[in-house]
């Protein structure tokens, strides 16, 4: 797990412009605009104004894109250490391995002294996967040194760590991932990824859904029940759409379902304001039918007829 200390505050402007040019982006007007964005004045709390000499604007519309340009060089360097290592590729070609048959190529590469590694990155958040702890420790040192020398970026030693995925979870983009045994194949232990919503994301989702469920029961101010239900349904779709790729999403959504059903049972079902009877609610759209049509958890508001999407019913 890598964490770059204050990444967006420490991007080197000169290096970034050279990277943009090296990528083939040579429109001088565009580069001028990017320079102006990078050097946009910042008003300080005391009222003074400073011109930044490094970093990209926090929340700036092109900051994520600039982050990818900066770290694109890291991606290629990591790839060159294993997947696209020129020495290994030459060795594979000499052995007559065709380019399409990468599995055989990797088998040969594993017999060399190369360090097997695979990177997954989103903006400045990235993970590097290795087979052994010793390899991971060496990779950690190498990447830390490379980032410092090539991009002038510093790794946070407190937040950067080596994790054994057989024993502990690693969090990435709101997910927590681990590997678990899946029997043996050709005499070797095989593993598959086990993934869930990370604890913080699950807790936040639970709090927001429960709060919105209470607002359906008792709308705030002049907001109507149908607006509150629509807001709740949007939240359900957002959570399910993002996290549905996790293997354990059904377990996580059942946890959320129990929390919101406590609110609905105490505040809505008890007051006879919800019904399971689909004839008393509005007709479901084609998309709603495909997604929730088979769910016994679906409820309808008796007053406005809107369906309340069941957070506990999620399909991969």
Ranges and model annotations:
Residues 51-56, 213-227, 239-251:
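Short, solvent-exposed helix-loop connector elements
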Residues 91-96, 159-168, 253-260, 276-285:
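A glycine-rich phosphate-binding loop feature that marks nucleotide/adenosyl-phosphate handling sites
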Residues 228-282:
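Non-catalytic, peripheral interaction segments enriched in hydrophobic/basic residues
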Residues 28, 69-72, 203, 226, ...:
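Alpha-helix N-cap/helix-start motif at coil-to-helix transitions, marked by capping-box chemistry
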Residues 256, 272-316:
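Extended C-terminal regions of large enzymes
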Residues 22, 76, 132, 149, ...:
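Short, well-ordered loop/turn and helix-capping segments at boundaries between secondary-structure elements
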Residues 39, 43, 48, 151-221, ...:
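A conserved non-catalytic segment of reverse transcriptases
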Residues 1-157, 162-165, 169:
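Conserved polymerase palm-domain catalytic core
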